[in-house]
Amino acid sequence: MAFDTMTAPPPAGGKWVRCTGPQLRKMARAGLLWLEQNRDHVNSLNVFPVPDGDTGTNMLLTMRSAYARIELSEETHVGKVAGQIAQGALMGARGNSGVILSQIWRGFAAGLANKEAFLAADLAQAFQGASDTAYKGVMRPVEGTILTVIREGAAEAADAARKSDDLRFMLERVLERCQQALERTPELLPILRQAGVVDSGGQGLVYIFEGMLRYAQGKLSLDGQQVAVAPAGEAVSAQALAVPEGGSLEFPYDVQFILTGRNLNVHEVRARIDAMGDSTVVVGDDRVIKVHIHVKDPGQPLTYGISLGHISDVVVENMQEQMEELVHGGAAPLASAAGAPPAVAP
């Protein structure tokens, strides 16, 4: 029997063929909650691009910002809900992983822009858009990361759509494929193999998808009740961390900000910012651009941004200090910024 009511995922055993805006909102909350439950595990895997132990925190802050845009919304149009999620993720994106996650949501939303509700074929298209947009947002895409995980997940979504119109079936297949891709990340990225871990950003994305599926299966409550936490596994030891020879990072400062202006050229901004350091992710449009980069001099990208318009949500983190905290057994400092979104209440 098909199940397509406005506000709830399918009951156990039901076939789910149509997803509405309220359903997507609940799934986004489920993904956020499951990531929140497993943030420490994601942080413990963080060795690339810098072993600063904050990937889980950055992805969580990004998801909180995304969900804050829709938490009280009564919108039923699934394309508009997806667009709100994407906008919230972009504005609140933290760190390299958070900005890439925002681009996954951006591509996902673009694929659903004109949909009142989505079917399996629409969801497969959205997954492909998520993968394509994420790759385009990174100056030099690296395999063995969150990019690989979303790309393989998108491929599986397309195959699942050809076999069934059941959305839950697709989510099950996508999660399984993403988990398999995650397990193979050490084969693609030597730094992960050296540390004996899978990619932290990819793991964070898997947790988000797992939360969504658990809710669709009726295995995850959104009413504030305690939920089971996935096994955390072992944290990366200080000896296994990919600490640069000599202990110093070439680009020790993580700089993030939002640039707003008129007639901005995102391609030109990306090229200029990229010349200042590495781990560049610059995304947006002619009015709003999100900038993330690792640099020697944090003043350089900030000054450039000011020359083009107005900068806000500025975050500057000393990754050298974060790395040393991890190496010496301390906890990595949490990402911080003025106006960071609050935790989602149960």
Which stretches of residues belong to each language-model region?
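N-terminal loops that bind phosphate or other acidic moieties
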Residues: 1-346
